[in-house]
């Protein structure tokens, strides 16, 4: 008789709204390790929440937070449909005994003592502080989307970009802590663990291990403390002085929750400071503790998180045996021995290579780990992850009380019924983006642009009038009138449009909507070879290609990263807005929003077509798995939005009065003087006309054979805004431009400007990320694509009789 086993149930098969217990996690390599680090470990209760509108990916809830993963990856996770155990955390009883329950049911934890308790972990009489002139270096580390960059801005007075989707910080940023001269804090990319799954995690790990800061400020989201403490445990293993900033405590209290901060300190062996970075609460005490532990080099009191009696002591014995075997190697490699042991035990090959163990030592370590696997009943990676989450569960049970559902989560669920609903998500996304364009280009931005344009024109007339009254040289008058006010002034008038667009994009970003867009669009993007996470750099690309290229570092796959970088320039950056607005106002004044929206969607469509070509040629294969945490919706912070708008306005003004000003002056000079350096009466006889004559034939097939147009396009290589200033200088007036170009030629020009190569700063960013060869190929390819599309538009229009 043949024994036929019943088919296994996978997470993919779990009905929505149902819960089950994970029994095993499939996959291999860094992907499987990432699953484990995100909490998808055996014996964990998981609930299927919803699927994306296109049916994939799947949203699940575990450990009191929510993740998204594709159905193909969910199929690798075996579950058993057993009821999840319900436990009442003892912390509720402790809090009630400590402070009582206030009317209304809000638990009141003991007040957290102020600074002065920091020295209780060590006897100061046996310690020697660092010299007063020693520079105290700190690493600011934490999960993505935990308020880390907000805290960095608060500590340093900097105004780094703050957003409510994973992956805002993509490079290290340094700053001084307030008025403390000999301090330096580094804002590191947000990570979930010290396993190098993505390039940002590798950057953070290499910094912490290589540069060894004097102290670590670990910021933890108190509303999602279970998820965040997983990284905390690995940071403690680095044996570096450390303080934990328990952020968003205001939200915890507002929801009727609480944290026994003093008990949490005892459990972790480091100072814990409750703060609210958004409200600037608790940061003074945090700074005092951080300076204290760094100056006295107070190392974490606890690094051992597994009990000797837990599961027969298998993991405990394994880790301590490995520590004994590798102690000398870890010291020579400059690596904390506990960290090295736990990483070896979970199978981290990078750490194993750095330790340089000989063959006998490798075999001894492997024997210890194999024995642990047999005793524990789990593979090595799952056993270590289980050890960490078991400790976190014990700590949270003893210190944390949460409501059944926070107000933020309930609100997010209601909003998501529309914004991620099966039939409403795509229409909502299209509607939101069209509303942004309409308000920017037809209502708010257009109104303030007209006001500023009138003001600049009036100022220009006033200054020229003064120069004429003073009988200033005519050539100098031309420089001021045509070069400065005609060129730079024409660009400045578009500042309101750029600020307005960034205002709306920052609202969407801060609120948490961008993460939902990634969730909704993942299946669609996968068809062109990308991951849903690629939507984040691409959406940033609508603002500026430089940070968009940098944001691609958050992608764990080199294939996805390269493909995203090459496609990002097709997302029209804000520097091109003045070109669109200028030409649209001149040739299509009644159809501004339609033309603008059409250009943006055309850029996306061309990018999709190029992606399909690249997917089938240079970038064959599948996109990496989509594992992402969905943050709750939050009200955008007025301070963050204000800082972002000021940064963008300041950057635009700096470019206007540096690169664009210089380009305008050069263009004016070349257009005013002939080859004999005498002023020419006809600009067609100028130096510039001779130079531009070489490239003009390239644009003749689409009706753009005027040398002034090719000159403007060449100036756009320096800065896209220079196209407008150059046209303004060379044509002198909008009427002259309209007389020189047909409407169809103007449309072809718009399409070419949309698609041709980005500015030199963006090209330099691509070169830094991918190398010079890739950057050069991108420039050539985009120019070819732009020419073909522009000519196609012109040819189609001419065939239909619109020429």
Question: Where are the regions a protein language model picked out?
Answer:
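Hydrophobic core segments of alpha-helical transmembrane domains in multi-pass membrane transport
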Residues: 428-439, 501-506, 584-586, 599-613, ...
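Core alpha-helical transmembrane segments of integral membrane proteins
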Residues: 419-519
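Extended, low-charge hydrophobic alpha-helical regions
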Residues: 375, 382-383, 402, 443-483, ...
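Conserved C-terminal guanine-recognition region of P-loop GTPase G domains, centered on the G4
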Residues: 180, 203-272, 579
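Transmembrane helix-loop junctions at the membrane interface of multipass transporters and ion channels
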Residues: 570, 574-597, 761-771, 792-803
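Juxtamembrane inter-helical linkers in multi-pass membrane proteins
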Residues: 458-462, 515-545, 620-644
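Alpha-helical transmembrane helix bundles of large polytopic membrane transport and channel proteins
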Residues: 243, 253-404
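Conserved G1/Walker A P-loop phosphate-binding module
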Residues: 110-193
């Amino acid at each position: 008789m043949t024994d036929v086993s019943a088919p296994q149930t996978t997470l993919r098969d779990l009905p929505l709204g149902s819960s089950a217990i994970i029994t095993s996690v499939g996959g291999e390599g860094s992907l499987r390790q990432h699953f484990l680090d995100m909490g998808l470990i055996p014996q964990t209760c998981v609930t299927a929440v919803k699927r994306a509108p296109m049916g994939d990916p799947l949203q699940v809830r575990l450990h009191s937070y929510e993740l998204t993963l594709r159905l193909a990856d969910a199929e690798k996770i075996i579950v058993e449909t057993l009821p999840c155990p319900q436990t009442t955390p003892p912390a509720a009883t402790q809090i009630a005994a400590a402070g009582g329950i206030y009317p209304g049911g809000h638990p009141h934890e003991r007040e957290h003592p102020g600074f002065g308790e920091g020295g209780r972990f060590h006897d100061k009489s046996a310690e020697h502080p660092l010299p007063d002139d020693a520079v105290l270096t700190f690493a600011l580390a934490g999960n993505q989307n935990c308020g880390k960059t907000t805290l960095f801005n608060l500590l340093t007075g900097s105004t780094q970009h703050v957003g409510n989707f994973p992956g805002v910080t993509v490079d290290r940023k340094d700053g001084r802590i307030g008025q403390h001269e000999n301090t330096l804090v580094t804002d590191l990319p947000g990570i979930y663990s010290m396993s190098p799954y993505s390039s940002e995690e590798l950057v953070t790990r290499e910094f912490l291990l290589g540069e060894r800061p004097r102290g670590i400020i670990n910021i933890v989201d108190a509303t999602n403390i279970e998820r965040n403490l997983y990284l905390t445990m690995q940071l403690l293993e680095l044996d570096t002085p450390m303080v934990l900033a328990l952020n968003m405590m205001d939200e915890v209290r507002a929801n009727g929750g609480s944290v026994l901060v003093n008990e949490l300190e005892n459990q972790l062996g480091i100072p814990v400071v409750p703060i609210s970075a958004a409200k600037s609460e608790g940061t003074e005490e945090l700074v005092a503790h951080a300076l204290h532990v760094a100056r006295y080099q107070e190392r974490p009191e606890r690094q051992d998180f597994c009990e000797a009696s837990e599961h027969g002591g298998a993991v405990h014995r394994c880790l301590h045996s490995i520590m004994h075997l590798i102690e000398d190697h870890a010291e020579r490699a400059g690596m904390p021995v506990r960290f090295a042991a736990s990483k070896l035990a979970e199978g981290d090959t990078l750490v194993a290579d750095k330790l340089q163990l000989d063959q006998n030592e490798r075999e001894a370590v492997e024997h210890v780990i194999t024995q642990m696997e047999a005793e524990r009943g789990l593979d090595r990676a799952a056993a270590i992850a289980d050890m960490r989450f078991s400790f976190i569960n014990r700590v949270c049970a003893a210190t944390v009380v949460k409501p059944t559902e926070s107000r933020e989560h309930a609100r997010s669920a209601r909003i998501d019924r529309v914004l991620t609903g099966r039939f409403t998500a795509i229409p909502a996304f299209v509607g939101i983006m069209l509303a942004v364009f309409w308000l920017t280009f037809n209502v708010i931005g257009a109104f303030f642009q007209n006001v500023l344009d009138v003001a600049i024109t009036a100022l220009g007339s006033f200054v020229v009038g003064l120069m004429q009254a003073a009988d200033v040289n005519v050539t100098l008058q031309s420089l001021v009138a045509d070069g400065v006010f005609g060129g730079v002034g024409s660009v400045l008038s578009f500042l309101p449009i750029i600020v307005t667009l960034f205002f709306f994009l920052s609202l969407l970003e801060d609120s948490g909507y961008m993460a939902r867009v990634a969730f909704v669009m993942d299946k669609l993007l996968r068809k062109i070879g990308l991951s849903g996470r690629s939507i984040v750099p691409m959406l940033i690309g609508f603002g500026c290609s430089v940070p968009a290229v940098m944001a691609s570092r958050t992608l764990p796959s080199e294939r996805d990263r390269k493909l995203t970088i090459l496609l990002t320039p097709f997302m029209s950056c804000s520097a091109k807005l003045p070109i669109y607005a200028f030409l649209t106002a001149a040739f299509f004044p009644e159809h501004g929003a339609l033309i603008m929206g059409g250009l943006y969607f055309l850029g996306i469509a061309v990018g999709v077509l190029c992606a399909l070509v690249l997917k089938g040629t240079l970038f064959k294969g599948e996109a990496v798995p989509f594992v992402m945490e969905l943050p709750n919706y939050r009200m955008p912070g007025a301070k963050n939005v204000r800082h972002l708008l000021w940064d963008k306005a300041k950057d635009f003004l700096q470019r206007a009065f540096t690169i664009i000003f210089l380009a305008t002056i050069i263009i004016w000079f070349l257009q005013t003087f002939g080859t004999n350096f005498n002023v020419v009466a006809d600009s067609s006889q100028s130096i510039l006309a001779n130079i531009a004559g070489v490239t003009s034939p390239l644009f003749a097939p689409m009706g753009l054979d005027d040398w002034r147009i090719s000159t403007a396009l060449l100036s756009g290589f320096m800065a896209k805004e220079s196209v407008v200033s150059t046209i303004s200088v060379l044509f002198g007036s909008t009427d002259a431009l309209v007389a020189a170009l047909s409407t169809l030629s103007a449309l072809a020009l718009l399409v070419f400007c949309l698609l041709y190569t980005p500015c030199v700063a963006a090209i330099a960013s691509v070169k830094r990320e991918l190398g010079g060869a890739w950057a050069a190929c991108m420039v050539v390819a985009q120019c070819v694509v732009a020419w073909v599309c522009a000519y196609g538009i012109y040819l189609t229009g001419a065939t239909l009789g619109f020429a």
